[in-house]
Amino acid sequence: MLEQCLALDERVRVIRLPVNVGTYGARNRAFDEATGDFITFLDSDDWAHPRRLEKQVQPLLSEDSLVATTCQALRVTEMLELTEPGRSPFTLGPASLMFRKDAALARLGYIDPIRGSADNEYLRRMIAVFGDNSLLRLRERLVVYRQRRGSLSRADFRGSLWIHPARYAYRSAYTLYHEDIRAGRTEPYLPKNPVHRQFPAPSHLVRADRAPASAEYDVVFAGDWRRFHGVQREMVEEMQMLSRQGLRVGVLQMATFRWMTSERLWVCLPVQRLINRGSVSYCLSTDQTSSALVLIRDPSILQFPRHQPPGVTAKLTAIVASEAPSALDGSDSRYVPQACTAAARELFGAPTVWIPQDQKVRHALEMSGLSQPELASFELPGVIDPREWRVERTGFRADVPVVGRHSRDSSTAWPRERETLFQVYPDSSDTDIRVLGGARSALEILGDAALPSNWLVYDYDEIDVRSFLYQLDFWVYFSDPAEGEALNREVLEALASGCVVILPHRFEETFGDAALYRHPTEVKETVQTYHRQRALFLAQSRRGRARVIELFDPSTYLKQTSTLLERSSPATGPQNEPAGVLPAGTGSQTSSEDGIEERSRSRT
C-alpha cells in the first residue's frame, strides 16, 4: 500500500525507521523531514474526510494570528461501532491537529517521546505558549478515530470519569508545567531526545527500555491530595522535612468518601510542585512499590476504601488521628477506628498503630475501644516551619481591627446559635471580618439572605493561607461545642504568622499562653482592648510565635518518626527512582486523545 501511495504524487515520501520508536518518535522524525508550511497527522487505522485538509488549512491561510486548527473526531471501534456508554463519541482532541511548522518547532520543539497522552500535552503546551485564541476548533466532523480492542488508548479509559492512574499523574504533572510556562517560570521547548525531563512521566507511559526500576520508600504519605486543606498542609510540612533529612518520600492518592465529587480534580498545586521538582514521588496504585512506613493523617480515607489495592506494601502503617471519630454528641460520624484498622491491614499488609494528635483525640479513640499497643503512647501534633509563616508585624492592618478565620465550611465549624455567631464575628462597622474557606454554613445558621456587609469571604482556593493571614490582626475560631475537632494546623499557622489568636477555653490545654481564651460574650471587648493597646497586641503576637517554636519543635516530630521507622524494617538498597514515575531531571510510545476535559486544581 505504501508503494501505491508513492505513485500517487511525486511529493509523497515513505520514510522507514530502522527500529520501532513508537508513534511520537515517528512524528518527531516527521517534524525534521517536513518541508511544507503546515504539519498534521493521520494514524494508519484512522479515516479522514477527503476535504479535511482543505477545511483545516483554509483558516490558517486566512488568519495569520492562528497557529493551529482541529476538527471534530468520531470515536469508534475497529468495526465502526459506538460502544462506550457514558462517554461522548465525539472529541475535539489532538488526533486532528494541524499547525504551522516553523512557529511550533521554534517555540515548542518536539512531542514528548513516551507511549501515550503526549499528543494532548503538545496541544496544550501550544495553547500555553501562543494563547487560547491561537487554536481554532472546527465543529465539523472530519475524522473517524478507530480504537482497537486491547489498545493502550482504549484500555486506559472507562466511561466519562475513570482514567488510568498513570495518565492522571501525567496530566496533573504537565498541567503544572504549562502553568509555569504561562507565568514565564520555565521554557516550553522540548528537544527530540531529552537528557533531562521538565516534568515526571509515569513508567506505564514510558518506553520499556527507559522505565525506572522498582522503588522502595522510607515513608509514603497516603491521603486525598486533590485538595489542600489543613491535613494536607500538615503532611506537606512533614514530607518536606523528611525529604530534607534524606529519606525517600512518596505520596499515594486515596480519595475520602466524605468529600466525594464527580468533578475531576488534579493533584493540588503545592504537592504537585514537590513531585515535579523531584522532592517526593507519586506512587501509582497500578505499580508495586514498598515502604517501611505508610503514614495516614486522615483516617476517613480508610472508611470506604477502593477495592483496588493501592500498590504499596508496608512494614508498618501509622494512622495519625487529627480529629475524633465523630462530634462529641455522636453526630458528624467521620470514621470507625476498627473498620479503618481492618482496611489498613488489608490494603498495606502491615501492622497498624494509631497515633492521636492530642489528648482530646486520644480520649475519643479510647472511648471508641482502642487501647495500647494498638494506640501509641505518644501524640504526634504535627510540625510547622515558623520561618515559612513569619509575617512582619509592627502594628495594625487598619483603623478598625481585622478579625478572621480559615477552616473547612461545615455547620459544626461555626457557633450553633445566631446570637453566639454574631458575638464572635459581629455585624458591625467597627470590625472587619474576613473568612477563608467559605461561609455558606454560617449563612444558613444566620438565616439571612446575605452575609453582613463588613464580612469578606474567600473560597478555599481563592487565596493562599499565608496571604490571607497577612491581612489579619486577630484570628478567632469558635465552633459548635459538640464539634470535638482539634484544629491544630490552622491555629499553628495563625500563631506562626503573628496573629493574636482567640479561642474557646477547651483549647487551653493544647496551646497554653500562646493564645487568649474567652467566652463568646468576651471576644469583641478583648479585640477592641488589644487593638487600642499596640504594645499589648505585639507582646501577645510575639508570645504566640515563640510558643509555636517551643511546643512544636520539628526535632520532636523527627524523633517520633524515627521511632516509627525503627519499629519497621527500613527500606534497603540504593535510592531508586519510583516505579510509578520517571522523574523530572531524567531522559525519556503510543496512543492519541486522552479524552480529559480541563478541570481544576486546588492551589492554596
Q: How should each PLM-predicted stretch be described?
A:
Residues 1-203, 495-497, 504-505, 525:
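Nucleotide-sugar donor-binding/catalytic module of glycosyltransferases
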Residues 476-492, 504-513:
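Nucleotide-sugar-dependent
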Residues 531-566:
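A charged, aromatic-enriched C-terminal amphipathic alpha-helix characteristic of glycosyltransferases
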Residues 220-222, 237-240, 247-347:
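Extended catalytic core of nucleotide-activated donor transferases of GT-like folds
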Residues 227, 232-245, 337, 350, ...:
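Conserved catalytic-core segment of nucleotide-activated headgroup transferases in glycan assembly
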Residues 461-473, 496:
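Short acidic alpha-helix that forms the nucleotide-activated donor recognition element
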Residues 292, 470-484, 499:
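Acidic donor-binding loop of glycosyltransferase active sites
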